[in-house]
Amino acid sequence: YDRKETYIHVNPNDGDEKRDVLYTLGINKSGDFKMYKPCFSAKEILNDGCQDAVMGFVPLIIDYEEFKDGDDIVPYGSRIDKPRQIVGQLKNGDYYILTAKAPGLTFQTSRDLLKKLDVPFAYDLDGGSSTQTTFFDERLTPVYRDVTGRKIPTIMTFEPIEIA
């Protein structure tokens, strides 16, 4: 680990803990999601054409196939029901968000649901206090930690576009 290199997985709010087992979700200039294995540097991700990146946990579905390695990467939360925030992209390029409130879903239950929905790609951002979803002015997920929730340095926004 070269401290001169900026890693997406270093979160200064968590004491600069290097999360070298988590995957990064990149978003390229066309708006397509791209998955990066642990320890890709921010420079490498930018050089690969991504303009944004989000660190959550792990992919659940890649190219329509279940990604089960995440169960061992995140053993403290993968095998028990937990609130989930899952984002993905459909074959036509549309995004989707799957929000599961408490008691939540396991990774496997999430994968089973996503497979039934025939999604090509799904990424678990987290759940509980680490992610919050607001749809227009309505909060879909409750605050699970403190009064205002955990301070999260990353925000993803999805804005509707009009199709002519």
Regions found by a protein language model. Name each.
Residues 1-164:
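Gly/Ser/Thr/Pro-rich low-complexity, intrinsically disordered segments
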